[in-house]
């Protein structure tokens, strides 16, 4: 029996400090040990789907109720929802206008300012002082806003729904959330407070 088939899945794995559910699974079942095997392209979560024979796409896609055939397989359902919504967010243009991504545990973010107001067209002599570009910490933090959506789903209404159909609906929610974040990001890019941070990446 492979290691991924021996893991005891618990709801508490979603609440470990500083770890996502997939990271908690990876700690118990590292993907590195599956190199050069048929499972090499799967992450720890996808291996659990394989363990419980849950197919989330394709011709033989399962229905929602397949997640709830056991208490352990049911633990995988919230991550299915999260991944579907995340795919929707990633399909927005947010990544196209972001030079870097920083995870922040507080409600404020203190970035960097880039001052390169001196022209780059200046030709310098051998002994002359070089034009300067200054990078410094911002004096005023950016107040981070939270975007979320409560999704109410009746189990009786969707238990027989195909997982790929549910995923499409969740991706739609994610895309709209992503577009809302894009709108806010563009506003920050245009503002005096966010311009230097945005330029610095």
Sequence positions of predicted segments:
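Short alpha-helical interface patches
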Residues: 21-26, 30-36, 132-133, 140, ...
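Phosphate-binding glycine-rich loops and adjacent basic patches that engage nucleotide phosphates
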Residues: 2-5, 38-44, 113, 128-139, ...
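Alpha-helical scaffold segments that mediate packing/assembly in large oligomeric complexes
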Residues: 149-201
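Intrinsically disordered, low-complexity terminal tails
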Residues: 1-70
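Short, exposed beta-strand "edge-strand" segments with a Pro/Gly-rich flavor and a Y/T-containing core
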Residues: 15-19, 108-110, 146-153
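Charged/polar, solvent-exposed surface patches and flexible loops
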Residues: 23, 47, 66, 79, ...
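Assembly/oligomerization interface modules of large self-assembling protein complexes
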Residues: 61-147
């Amino acid at each position: 029996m492979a290691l991924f088939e021996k893991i005891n899945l618990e709801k508490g794995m979603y609440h470990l400090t500083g770890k996502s559910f997939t990271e908690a699974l990876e700690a118990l079942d590292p993907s590195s040990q599956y190199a050069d095997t048929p499972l090499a392209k799967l992450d720890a979560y996808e291996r659990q789907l394989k363990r419980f024979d849950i197919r989330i796409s394709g011709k033989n896609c399962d229905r929602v109720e397949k997640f709830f055939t056991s208490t352990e397989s049911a633990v995988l359902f919230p991550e299915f929802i999260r991944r579907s919504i995340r795919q929707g967010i990633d399909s927005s243009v947010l990544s196209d206008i972001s030079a870097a991504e920083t995870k922040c545990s507080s409600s404020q973010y203190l970035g960097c300012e880039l001052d390169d107001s001196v022209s780059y067209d200046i030709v310098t002599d051998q002994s002359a002082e070089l034009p300067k570009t200054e990078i410094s910490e911002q004096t005023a933090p950016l107040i981070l806003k939270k975007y979320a959506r409560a999704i109410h789903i009746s189990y009786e209404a969707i238990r027989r729904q195909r997982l790929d159909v549910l995923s499409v609906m969740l991706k739609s929610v994610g895309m709209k959330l992503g577009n809302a974040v894009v709108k806010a990001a563009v506003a920050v890019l245009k503002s005096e407070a966010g311009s230097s941070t945005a330029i610095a990446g």
